[in-house]
Amino acid sequence: MPDIRLPDGSVRSFDKPVTVHEVAASIGAGLARAALAGRVDGQLVDTSYLIDRNADLAIVTDKDADGLSVIRHSTAHLLAYAVKELFPEAQVTIGPEIENGFYYDFAYKRPFTPEDLAAIEKKMAELAKKDIPVERYELPRDEAIAYFKSIGEAYKAEIIESIPQGEVLSLYREGEFTDLCRGPHVPSTGKLKVFKLMKVAGAYWRGDSKNEMLQRVYGTAWAKKEDLDAYLYMLEEAEKRDHRKLGVQLDLFHLQDEAPGMVFWHPKGWQLWQNVEQYMRAKLNHEGYKEVRTPMMMDANLWERSGHAANYRENMFITESEKRDYAVKPMNCPGHVQIFNSGLRSYRDLPLRYAEFGSCHRNEPSGALHGIMRVRGFVQDDGHIFCTEDQINQEAKDFHRLVMEVYDRFGFDKVAIKLALRPEKRIGEESTWDKAEEGMREALRACGVEWEELPGEGAFYGPKIEYHIKDALGRSWQCGTLQLDFMLPERLDAEYVADDNSRKRPVMLHRAALGSLERFLGILIENHAGAFPLWLAPVQMVVMNITEAQAEYAAEIAKELEKQGFRVELDLRNEKIGYKIREHSLQKLPYQIIVGDKEKADGLVAVRARGEDLGQLTLEAFAARLKAEMPEA
């Protein structure tokens, strides 16, 4: 009879098989009411799951991440139930949990309207209030196909037909609605109390544009109302900070149909870019990197030898000239190996660090493009370190220090570190992967940091350390990477002369602190809501006159500040000063300098700092304030 070990180490013995719910009830009535699912020997299961052996069990409630996952998945089914109640002719397809919520795809004769969405959400609330039991049962594959065909659910039947013969499938029934699902689900609809439908979008069946267009209803679900309110507030703030809107409002960049996934940078936007790039260039120079430049296009044969053609071809732009195939580079690494290979290298040259603000192009699907965050043409702050195995840990430590200093400079103080391990599609021997992954773990230990491991998410040629920064809205963005690669030096025949005069392969470390500069600038725009710190702002201040009488004095002030190295705009338009102040406030400039007759007579400037009136200052005092505000180089 089963002995059940709980997370605190205590063991409960039962004289017959017992469900997860019954174990929870034996601990306390409160826990039984709160139980949403269980984790039996690491596997997430329903509360109705019968345990007939000795096992480890954790009861899952809405306080656990697993609990929230179960709530969201179950709410997707509640959505489908409500749609079938209101629109019986609609056919259901798939409805998974996603980040912060869920979606469900439906086939219906007409698009769902905002009024439909409100009615569906109301029906979901009614069904939840009824606290209808959610029951799991199993059917053989062929019976499941016959069942779904009998109720007119052709899409579900098609899904099951792709499952091998002889499989037994799990179905979930709540009231009049039954769905195919692995589960687990909440024990009853009454556990689903906090949800909201967000929007409807189109989605092709099975993600194939040749198939029919379905309607995807997105929703969000939470354990507590205050969590939902906080999420909706975050979305509202995110909309205000949307880099696509601010990019136009602040005259930084624009996008247009003639160049999908490519960015047109305006003067202010390009100044912002240069502020970031020049800071990174100085940082890399200080760290001993040698800046290089590699061709935009190289013979397809090189990409075949590197492994990119076999593992990345669908993302590459291919062209032809004089009967030779060329690929526009999606990455900089093979080019850096060519520079390494251009001369005889000695162990005394290592570590050799190359850096490139390399322009890359990737053939991203048009549906995946998003402002400047997801583009087809982008620049990476790329770098490659050629070193010996003995040098890996020190190089990793040095890069870790560098990347943390960079994030601190840009105002990101919350950084999570993750280790992405071998993907399903990869090159190289398993023993090489074992060595590379353990090498990355050793490097992280040497840095003295904690990390999370992500199985299956490494690059096709090696594992990678990922740096995830958290922005002002609490959103996480993966930016920096450090990848350990034994494969590419082998495939492209890179070697150096060792201290015993033998030829050896270098280890290659791929590294980037920011990743795509376009994406990082998008993150910066949204993080600061366009109100950049002084050092980063494309225009740091504007000098405005009140009347024509102060125009010459205003121009002198602007010229003197420019001479001291500041980025200054001069606004001498014949407009009311209130109008000029409001207009420049929308541009989110760090400082506005106003000069009238009094300032001109006294040799002063009136200063506003993003709405805060700093009063009248001498130009020397104001310049000293500016210099004190600028970070050290």
UniProtKB/Swiss-Prot annotation:
PANTHER family (alphabetical): THREONINE--TRNA LIGASE, CHLOROPLASTIC_MITOCHONDRIAL 2, THREONINE-TRNA LIGASE
Function of the molecule: Catalyzes the attachment of threonine to tRNA(Thr) in a two-step reaction: L-threonine is first activated by ATP to form Thr-AMP and then transferred to the acceptor end of tRNA(Thr). Also edits incorrectly charged L-seryl-tRNA(Thr).
Annotated binding of Zn(2+), by residue: 333, 384, 510
InterPro entries with a match to the protein in the record: aa-tRNA-synt_IIb, aa-tRNA-synth_II, aa-tRNA-synth_II/BPL/LPL, Anticodon-bd, Anticodon-bd_dom_sf, Beta-grasp_dom_sf, TGS, TGS-like
Encoding gene, per UniProt annotation: thrS
Domain TGS: 1-61
CC per GO annotation: cytosol
A biological process from GO: threonyl-tRNA aminoacylation
Region (Catalytic): 242-533
Main location: cytoplasm
CDD domains to which the protein is assigned, alphabetical: TGS_ThrRS (cd01667), ThrRS_anticodon (cd00860), ThrRS_core (cd00771)
Protein localization: Cytoplasm
UniProt keyword RNA-binding, yes or no: yes
Name assigned to this protein: Threonine--tRNA ligase
HAMAP family assigned: Thr_tRNA_synth (MF_00184)
Domain of life, per lineage: Bacteria
